[in-house]
Structures are given as C-alpha cells and as structure tokens.
C-alpha cells in the first residue's frame, strides 16, 4: 500500500467516527459506520500477507452484515413509529435487531468469533484502532438508545462475554489474541452497566482505551507478537517492560492502579440497582482474565531467559523515546487518586 494513503485512511476513520457520534438521524449514523469500515480494511490488509487478506475479508463480511442489520432495524422503527431519530427507538423488534447488530460490530458474545481472528491478522497499530477507535461509534449508538434496550439481554451477553473472554484467553500465546479476548471481557463490564449508568459505561470505555493503547504501543515498540518475544525483550528495554507490567496489572483491575476504578464503580452501581448476584458473578469471572494478565506481566519482567551473549551493548541499546506511550502508561497507572472527583461527576 502506498504510504501516502495511510494519513487519508486515518482521517477517514476520524471523519466516520465524528459523523456517527454527532448525528441524530439513523441514515447519517449508518453512513459514518460504513466510512469507518471502508477506511480500516486497507489498513488491515496493507502487508498483503495471506493472513492479513483473510482478516480483512472476515472483517468486511461481518461488518457488512451488522450494518445491514442496523439499517433494517432503523427502517423497521421508522415504519412503526414514523421517527428516524436515534433516541426514539421504541419498537421492540427494532430494539432487538439493533442490540444484535451492535453486538456484532463490538464483538460481544455470542457474535465474537470474528474479532480474535481479525486482530491476529492485523498489524499491531491497526489492531489498536480495531480495539479502541472502531468500537466508539457502535458504543455511542448503544448509549443513545440505552433507555430502550432490554437490561436482561444485555446482562446475559455481558456475563457471557466476561466469562468467554477470560476463559479463551487462558491458553493463548499470541499477544494480539490475548488482547482481543481482553477486549471482549472488558466489553462485558461496559455492557452490564450501560442501561443503568451510561456515563459510567462511557468512563469505563475511556479508561479501557487509555490502558489498551498503552499496551499496544509498548508491544509495538518492542515488536512483541508472542510471549517468547516479550520474554527476550527485557535485556533491551527494561524500563518499558516494567511499565508494560504495571499497565497489564492495571488492565486486570488490581488496586491501586487506574483499572481498579471502573470495576469498583460498576460493582457499586450494580449493588445499588439490587443486582448483587450479577455483580458477584462478573467480579468472579474477571479472575479468569486476571490469570492471563498476570502471565503476561510475569513474562515481561519477572522471568529472564539464559543469555549466552556477553556483548554489553544490548543492555544499553538506545531506543528513541516515545512521548505518547509514556503519557498513556502514566495515565494507566496513576489515575486512581482522581477517582473521588470522577465519582462525584458520575
């Protein structure tokens, strides 16, 4: 792919996202989703590797089906109510179809099958876009229609996503697949609270985006596509590996790191809504995710493979500093002290 095309595609992603999140009309929102889909496909397949082309094909087919469902849902609602306004989703069939369509776009269980495979076939920075930016427009549609959605259905999908994301990530060795199942698990936390507190769901997504971006950028810096590559990178980038360990623990939701805050607030809100069994279930299921985060952290810092080379330069290999990675990692680790202020806002 021509390198000059990359900025155009990234700008198209920004344009599509802006159109979707700022529109109140279903057709405009659908147009933004389609712009996003068409812009990300060349970024997925730019390496021309057969796996990348396969990932792009899977992504296109899945997103095309989801977009058709979004359009069909909005048309059904307009037929029944005469309204094209996104917030006026009142028809029960339309609500069900929209929930299924957005679940496909986000990769929620039981429509998650495409997401790990597409992420595994994509470059690390494209995988970052798929895990963060590409989830924002569909999530915005869910937030705008949250009052019309079925809480029981979303709770069931959320618990299933948290369980499957943790369970399937246990035996993975590829970092992109681990982060894909991590994304599915985090989407479960967002989905379970979305109907009861949309602001808290949005806060959880923002913090997830910050932490996941820090992990992807750190992995891209050390070129780690699997656990063994993380294992041997310590001798070259010890500071970055230590930071990566802390960000992974933050993603796991361990105090006193940033990732603990949204899970704490979600469990508190679920308890207020008299959903204590659901709060207990999702908290217990998140322990599955904790295991593979700990395994990643263990490989990144605690283990050190036998090193037969006596060449000292590898211990002092200079890497160009990355300011965005440093900022995102700092936010991923140090935001918890601000939680009382954030809680007051929410």
Swiss-Prot record:
Q: How does it sit in the membrane?
A: Multi-pass membrane protein
Q: Which domain of life is it from?
A: Eukaryota
Provide the alphabetized UniProt keywords.
Electron transport, Membrane, Mitochondrion, Mitochondrion inner membrane, NAD, Respiratory chain, Translocase, Transmembrane, Transmembrane helix, Transport, Ubiquinone
Give the UniProt subcellular location, in the record's own words: Mitochondrion inner membrane
GO terms under cellular component: mitochondrial inner membrane
Which InterPro entries has this protein been placed in?
A: Complex_I_Subunit_2, NADH_DH_su2_C, NADH_UbQ_OxRdtase_chain2, ND/Mrp_TM
Its predominant location is mitochondrion
Taken from the UniProt record, the cysteine pairs bridged by disulfide bonds within this chain are none
Write down the top EC class of this protein.
translocase
The Enzyme Commission number assigned here is 7.1.1.2
Sequence intervals crossing the membrane: 25-45, 60-80, 95-115, 124-144, 149-169, 178-195, 200-219, 247-267, 274-294, 326-346
What are the recorded GO MF terms, alphabetically?
NADH dehydrogenase (ubiquinone) activity
Any GO BP annotation: mitochondrial electron transport, NADH to ubiquinone
Pfam families with a match to the protein in the record = NADH_dehy_S2_C, Proton_antipo_M
**Which reaction does this chain catalyze?**
a ubiquinone + NADH + 5 H(+)(in) = a ubiquinol + NAD(+) + 4 H(+)(out)
- Transferase listed as a keyword: no
Q: List the PANTHER family hit by this protein, alphabetically.
A: NADH-UBIQUINONE OXIDOREDUCTASE CHAIN 2
Q: What does the similarity note say?
A: Belongs to the complex I subunit 2 family.
Q: Per its database record, what is this protein's job?
A: Core subunit of the mitochondrial membrane respiratory chain NADH dehydrogenase (Complex I) that is believed to belong to the minimal assembly required for catalysis. Complex I functions in the transfer of electrons from NADH to the respiratory chain. The immediate electron acceptor for the enzyme is believed to be ubiquinone.
- Name of the featured protein: NADH-ubiquinone oxidoreductase chain 2
Q: Which gene encodes it?
A: MT-ND2
């Amino acid at each position: 792919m021509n390198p000059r095309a990359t900025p155009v595609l990234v700008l198209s992603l920004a344009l599509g996202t802006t159109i979707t999140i700022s529109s109140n009309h279903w057709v405009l929102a659908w147009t933004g989703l389609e712009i996003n889909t068409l812009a990300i496909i060349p970024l997925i397949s730019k390496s021309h590797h057969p796996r990348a082309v396969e990932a792009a094909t899977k992504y296109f087919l899945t997103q095309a089906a989801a977009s058709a469902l979004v359009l069909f849902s909005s048309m059904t609602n307009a037929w029944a109510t005469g309204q094209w306004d996104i917030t006026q989703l009142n028809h029960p069939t339309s609500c069900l179809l929209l929930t299924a369509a957005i679940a496909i776009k986000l990769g929620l269980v039981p429509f998650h099958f495409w997401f790990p495979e597409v992420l595994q076939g994509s470059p690390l920075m494209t995988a970052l876009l798929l895990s963060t930016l590409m989830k924002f427009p569909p999530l915005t549609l869910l937030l705008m229609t949250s009052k019309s959605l079925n809480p029981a259905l979303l709770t069931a999908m959320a618990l299933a996503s948290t369980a499957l994301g943790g369970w399937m990530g246990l035996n993975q060795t590829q970092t992109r697949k681990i982060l894909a199942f991590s994304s599915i698990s985090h989407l479960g936390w967002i989905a379970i609270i979305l109907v009861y507190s949309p602001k808290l769901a949005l806060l959880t997504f923002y913090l997830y985006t910050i932490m996941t971006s820090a992990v992807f950028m750190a992995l891209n810096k050390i070129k780690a596509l699997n656990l063994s590559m993380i294992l041997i990178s310590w001798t070259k980038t010890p500071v970055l590996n230590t930071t990566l360990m802390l960000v992974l623990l933050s993603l796991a939701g361990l105090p006193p790191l940033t990732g603990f805050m949204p899970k704490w607030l979600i469990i508190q809100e679920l308890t207020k809504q008299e959903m204590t069994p659901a709060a207990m279930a999702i908290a217990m299921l998140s322990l599955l995710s904790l295991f593979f985060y700990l395994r990643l952290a263990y490989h990144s810092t605690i283990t050190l493979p036998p090193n037969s080379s006596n060449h000292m330069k590898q211990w002092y290999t200079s890497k160009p500093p990355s300011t965005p990675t440093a900022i995102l990692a700092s936010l991923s680790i140090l935001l918890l002290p601000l939680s009382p202020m954030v809680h007051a806002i929410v």
